[in-house]
């Protein structure tokens, strides 16, 4: 992958695959780049494959909102770990799937 994400349109099906397999927002690629590429998807469905320890909260929130508000059907698939902001992105799916051996980590909430 050239970035922390990869988008593959699939000519044989109606589902595009999006892979978030690294630190969210790393390598000088921000949410705007991700969202700009997300807009190019022509398929009816989007599968977001996640294996990430997290990353930039602000980029992650923008990605969550873009996926949650997308007109396509979004399925998020935790394939290894969705930790920190990656767990928030995972919650953007219309359908959320996890393998039995996958991990989903959220931070301890705090309130005043």
What are the language-model segments listed below?
Residues 1-87, 91-112:
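N-terminal organellar transit peptides
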């Amino acid at each position: 992958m050239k970035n922390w994400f990869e988008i593959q349109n699939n000519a044989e099906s109606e589902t595009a695959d999006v892979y978030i397999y690294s630190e969210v927002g790393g390598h000088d690629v921000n949410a705007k780049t991700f969202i700009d590429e997300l807009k190019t998807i022509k398929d009816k469905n989007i599968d977001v494959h996640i294996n990430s320890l997290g990353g930039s909260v602000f980029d992650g929130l923008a990605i969550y909102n873009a996926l949650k508000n997308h007109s396509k059907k979004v399925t998020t698939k935790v394939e290894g770990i969705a930790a920190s902001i990656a767990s928030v992105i995972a919650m953007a799916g219309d359908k959320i799937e996890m393998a039995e051996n996958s991990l989903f980590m959220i931070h301890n909430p705090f309130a005043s």
